[in-house]
């Protein structure tokens, strides 16, 4: 691949092969260990170079969110781990009705422990994404997001937010702005949504994503 250093080419090739094998992107430490690179900061530097040269896209606040650009997305051949319940669909767009609870879920997804980092799989659930409001965060229609059960979130974190008076839920970045909440899409064509802070309930924070490669 022209314009890349030898190290950048090796990192790119490793990412592609890792996605083919596992169905999700490697963490920085995976790359460092496998390619015997001196430090994670060196890996991060080369990932920034790959991104600036237009070969990958990254979403910094989500574990393992690396996407190959202008390349055939490799299909996973192996995906091991434990099952996490898929509780329903979440809107990446306008809010939709709250998904069913886990007691009524007959759907699940096989998730490697590594994909959620330090989060225990028992504290994690999954939702299928409907819509395109988070495409600039590398989350597209048909992807599955993994969320950690929690009722609080910091500014800028991606969450499942329930609009209480409408009993609907949406996937957005959350920002607390005094007595109101801004739910911000990651799509330049869409506008933020604003609600009174008392009308918004955090139902989970996004900790990973499984891409729909079909």
From Swiss-Prot:
Cited SUPFAM superfamilies: LexA/Signal peptidase, Winged helix' DNA-binding domain
Domain of life: Bacteria
InterPro entries listed in its UniProt record: LexA, LexA-like, LexA/Signal_pep-like_sf, LexA_DNA-bd_dom, LexA_repressor, Peptidase_S24_LexA, Peptidase_S24_S26A/B/C, WH-like_DNA-bd_sf
EC number: 3.4.21.88
Pfam families reported in the protein's UniProt record: LexA_DNA_bind (PF01726), Peptidase_S24 (PF00717)
Annotation: DNA-binding region: 28-48
UniProt keyword annotations, A-Z: Autocatalytic cleavage, DNA damage, DNA repair, DNA replication, DNA-binding, Hydrolase, Repressor, SOS response, Transcription, Transcription regulation
Transmembrane segments: none
Reaction equations catalysed: Hydrolysis of Ala-|-Gly bond in repressor LexA
Positions bearing the site annotation: Cleavage: 92-93
GO biological process: DNA repair; DNA replication; negative regulation of DNA-templated transcription; proteolysis; SOS response
Residues the record marks as active site: 133, 172
Molecular function as annotated in GO: DNA binding; serine-type endopeptidase activity
Biological function: Represses a number of genes involved in the response to DNA damage (SOS response), including recA and lexA. In the presence of single-stranded DNA, RecA interacts with LexA causing an autocatalytic cleavage which disrupts the DNA-binding part of LexA, leading to derepression of the SOS regulon and eventually DNA repair.
Subunit structure: Homodimer.
Cited HAMAP family: LexA (MF_00015)
Annotated family: Belongs to the peptidase S24 family.
Identification of the protein by name: LexA repressor
Species of provenance: Herpetosiphon aurantiacus (strain ATCC 23779 / DSM 785 / 114-95)
This protein's encoding gene: lexA
């Amino acid at each position: 691949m022209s314009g890349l250093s030898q190290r950048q080419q090796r990192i790119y090739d490793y990412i592609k092969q890792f996605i083919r094998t596992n169905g999700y992107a490697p963490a920085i430490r995976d790359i460092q260990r496998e390619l015997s690179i001196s430090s994670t900061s060196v890996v991060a530097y080369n990932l920034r170079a790959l991104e600036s040269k237009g070969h990958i896209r990254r979403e910094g606040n989500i574990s393992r969110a690396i996407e190959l650009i202008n390349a055939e997305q490799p299909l996973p051949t192996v995906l091991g781990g434990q099952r996490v319940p898929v509780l329903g669909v979440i809107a990446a767009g306008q809010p939709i009705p709250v998904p069913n609870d886990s007691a009524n879920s007959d759907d699940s997804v096989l998730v490697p422990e590594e994909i959620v980092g330090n989060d225990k799989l028992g504290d994690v659930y999954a939702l299928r994404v409907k819509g395109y409001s988070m495409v600039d965060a590398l989350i597209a229609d048909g992807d599955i997001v993994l969320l950690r059960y929690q009722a609080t979130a910091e500014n800028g974190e991606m969450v499942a937010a329930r609009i209480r008076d409408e009993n609907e839920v949406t996937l957005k970045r959350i920002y607390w702005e005094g007595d109101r909440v801004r739910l911000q899409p990651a799509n330049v064509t869409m506008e933020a949504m604003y609600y009174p802070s008392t009308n918004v309930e955090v139902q989970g924070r996004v900790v990973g994503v499984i891409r729909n490669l079909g």
